[in-house]
Amino acid sequence: MSGHSKWATIKRKKDAIDSKRGAIFTRVGKEITVAAKMGGGDPEGNPRLRLAILKAKSVNMPKDNIERAIKKGTGELEGVVYEECLYECFGPAGIAIMVSAVTDKKSRTTPEIKSILTKLGGSLATSGSVSRLFEKKGVIVLESSQIGEDKLVDLAVGEGAEDVINEGEVYRVITTPDDYESVLHALNEKGLKSEESEIRYIALVSSEIADKEVAKKVMKLIEQLDGHDDVTSVTSNFELAASLEKEFE
């Protein structure tokens, strides 16, 4: 099991809790607002907004919430002004971490992210030193109880997906950024609901962690980064050694 798979499990559990208190809607709403601000409120002419709306629908965000978020971005409704932040970070044992955030005050968010890193053996990195270790991919996570693996592979790959990974309770569909929208739309059209869907950074090379205490610190760091109110996604290149997998099930 890779670090990404393990983190996917943690993230799914966290998202299940978040959804009960509306945190996911808040995060997705920010993404919609930023997209509308940058490219206008018409999804047909704004691919980024179209993708953000697809993501909102995949987590069952109410239509009224989506429309309000768009209007905040276009200025039709008053609201705070958001901006995107991308933090390149190093964690314990030199693991690489990419943190994406949307904030209304970068001067607040950056020190808070830095503080989380410092307390748990991490640090902010210089621009380009970490991002070169990752590439952007479309990632769609589905509960495996919804569809058989062979049927999903036929459907997803037929629409341009690069890979379908069976992780037991869930499938992880990987696409290029360009094919992400068509694959997600095809899955939605078949009535398949995604637990998570976004274009995010994926590590090109993994970094194995074999020390239990270091692994605990890494997991805690990523949980705290992802728990920050302004953070929209966290991706790392760590991979748990086989000897530690049962410790973190």
From Swiss-Prot:
Give the molecular function GO annotations: DNA binding
Q: Which GO terms describe its biological process?
A: regulation of DNA-templated transcription
UniProt keyword DNA-binding, yes or no: yes
> Which keywords, in A-to-Z order, does the entry hold?
Cytoplasm, DNA-binding, Transcription, Transcription regulation
Spell out the GO cellular component terms annotated for this protein, sorted alphabetically and separated by semicolons. cytosol
**Family according to the record:** Belongs to the TACO1 family.
The protein's name: Probable transcriptional regulatory protein LBJ_0543
